[in-house]
Amino acid sequence: MKLKRYFIVWIGVSLMLLTVLLTLFTTMADDGMVWDYQFLFEQVVKHFVTMIFPMCITLISGYMISREYTDDTLKNIETLPISFRKLLAGKLIVSAILSLFLGIVCFVFTVIANFIMGYDGFALIPALTGLVQMALLGFFLYLTMLPIIVLTSRYKGSFLVGVIVAFVYGFIGMFANGTLQSIYPVSAALGLINYRAGAEGVMWNKGLCFISILIMCAIAVSYTHLRAHETAAN
């Protein structure tokens, strides 16, 4: 399978490790905060959403899609019983699976870090909940990045622009609060996994969160159809 040759997937795994290491680095601050498993998990999620994962999944997805242009294999599609639209959809589905996988990888690194640091509070039920939350969070964040991925992977090397845009897009989510946090797609992904629900200042409107991400999906699907028509015309 071609995916096995994509070193960039291993870069994704490395970035998940970086997410946890970056979180552990913040423990060096002498702010009097007592760390336990739950607090570590919440901090990892924060860095996962606002700094690492948006650019990570955009990099991986954009690279896989753009290979058809950089390897000059797109012209060979005409000789195969498969349309460009189906090929693109297949790669987007693979990216969706990878988003779930990377979320799980990040969670595993988080648990390992928790045991290495010797934090209290680890229990089976919260851990299983965290596993599901992190996997779904990766998937929902992928959906929010779909328009960027599809739009910027059209030309050779242009997906790197998408990586930069995705990083800024994710970082801005750090500042969303109030009603805006349920509207802004990146932070809306947190609402769908019920992140810190009930904590001070954290109130989610699940309906708005769902609509926000659904709109991003609709934009991506529309542009995917447009790209397919352009490719067929050429």
Locations of the language-model features?
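Aromatic- and glycine-rich beta-strand/loop motifs that create alpha-glucan
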Residues: 1-13, 154-157
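Conserved small/polar residues in nucleotide/adenosyl-binding loops
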Residues: 224-231
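Helix-loop-helix units of permease transmembrane domains in multi-pass membrane transporters
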Residues: 64-96
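Long, hydrophobic alpha-helical segments
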Residues: 45-67
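Short, membrane-exposed interhelical loops at transmembrane-helix boundaries
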Residues: 185-203
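Secretory targeting signals
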Residues: 20-53, 89-154
